[in-house]
């Protein structure tokens, strides 16, 4: 019974940490070939995709000036941002962004 309770406590603690982290992937329909498909493979965070042509208010709110842009938030506040270069391709890798997410999680312990 003690082991079950400890497992539940660990699960609840880690679930609450993960739910506080969000990765937002901004892109546009006209830039679909440069979409960072691997964003959906990120773990331990919520993932949101925003098409700036369909959601200009979100583009403005997050001050997105180039696509794709990936923003990692914790508790709604921006922690890190990766933006495309002049060719509209993002240079960051899935590993770069996952490492940042992992660091955010570890900083809470």
Residue spans for each PLM region:
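N-terminal post-signal-peptidase region of extra-cytosolic proteins
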Residues: 52-57
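Soluble periplasmic/extracytoplasmic beta-strand elements of cell-envelope proteins
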Residues: 23-25, 69-71, 81
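Structural micro-motif
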Residues: 62-72
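Sec-dependent N-terminal signal peptides
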Residues: 4-14
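Extracytoplasmic/secreted cell-surface and envelope-processing proteins
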Residues: 33-35, 58, 82
